């Protein structure tokens, strides 16, 4: 049963309470809930209890599990064994080993924070995230920092941002008389999209192996035109994978809830129940890792790239974000009468102001080479950041701005017209799937995040920008003689000054680009365009003032993101050249030679050879074009090495190299459409996308 296996591999609260002495358990809870310092004596007791629990489950090793700036997790395994006299060993795990580790920091991305010869780095236990057993190893969630204390990971800043929004939200809540609230946390439920393909097909595609996406591939006769895959019947192999995945996730305490087919062929989605943001980030990393591992067991490969196939939808990760108090109140819950809910309206305005003032940071938080293929491609939100509030909330805000009466709307009963079907109330607002940042009930759904990315960066930005607006609100209201009057003016002024960010229309419509420009909204189409704003003074001041990033830490992340962008495209370009020179051109050239021989033989016999003659001419022309296109790409890659700095190099890849790759792909894909299947060196889109039955 699910209840028997759920969290069975997690040293969770129930396990701690059962295994720890009462005073130790209370001390640990004070650390987790209030951020109190953990005494080494307490850590030693906790470490020993964890070790005993893990050994009972067959564990021999432990690891400090952390999230460097690579976007994936890292771990180094150490055994529990310790030598004793007589050549024997005992199993030990000390408080110091629990609290602190020392991996090599020089081999991870640091953005200049560490030189290659400066190898010392530290991992430190994140007591707010439960330890778990994975692949027979006790995993201890940790943060990762340099010898000088600079954050080298994704989690440290996330935890700092959670503290920032907690501090500022508590200030605002106290003004409303919420004396019983002691902490505020953000919660997240990230919907994870992915593709599953047959491993035999995957193994024959160099591009999938090296880059995670197809760099060549002519469109299959059928794609997603019929909308028959979305929510369609799940195929047996996929269903078996999903069942296996759910069980593995449940054992690790991941609240896997929903599974279904997505829009594109071979595309699927898994959505979890909400949990505290840093735990959600850990769980999402585990989810992506387990998706890959479980797929292998079923003869499948899980593709998490944002755009693995051209011509069909790519994959995203919808980041459902909300703010809640420790008393169980969702601060983004409108309630039955949102127009009378001043606390809700104030927090809503903080989010509106944050999104408007920091459009650039939200775009930066989702910027990657892979996600650039997806954003603005009529399958995902545009690269322009805007907010969807729906008609009800928009009308309320308009009434407040104009100081006009708002009578409210009674909830409408939806009648379908069949007497045997139940009646139910229509939601206050429809869903807008084209909006990057949309209200969906009592949360915001940020849809720009790419499927392969960690959710840590995005939520670090979200938490920090909202914390900043709450700080400004608290500063103003705390000193107000007339609190209600000042709050009314603040809400009204915020709506007036920031309503440009609200757009309830079709984000896919070309006219929105022009309208957004008229409104003064940013349209940062590519990763380099977005990263050009990362170190703007207002952004540096924001993170430094809330102690989320130092200027050096932010600069390092800018450098890592910029370098990663160029490195990814370089790998893709080199892979294209390898496939072109070594596989495509030899295969098509050989076939053209054979075709020419057949053409000459037919002509010698006086037979009609129109097909052979036309195809030979067409393939010869395409071969020549492919040869030239590959040569240009190769030369431009060589020339790119002379770029003076990381920004210039990224610009070369954004324009010249990506254009070269597009030109080469067009020619090669055209060759595929007229080449026999047994000649073409790679499985086709049709074979890959429809190969799992």
Q: Where in the sequence are the language-model features?
A:
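Flexible inter-domain linker/hinge segments
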Residues: 1-14, 167, 171-174, 391
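Gly-rich Lys/Arg/Thr-decorated short loops/hinges at beta-loop-alpha junctions or inter-strand turns
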Residues: 1-12, 32-33, 150, 221-230
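Histidine/acidic residue-rich metal-binding segments in metalloenzymes
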Residues: 6-95, 99-115
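Active-site proximal loops enriched in glycine and acidic residues that flank catalytic Cys/His/Asp
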Residues: 42, 66, 94, 272-274, ...
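Active-site-proximal loop/turn and secondary-structure-junction residues that shape catalytic pockets
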Residues: 42-46, 66-68, 96-97, 144, ...
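Short linear, low-complexity motifs centered on an aromatic residue
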Residues: 71-86, 106, 111, 205, ...
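Glycine-rich, acidic/polar active-site loops that bind/position phosphate-bearing ligands
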Residues: 118-304, 313-316, 323-559
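C-terminal amphipathic alpha-helical interaction region
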Residues: 491-693
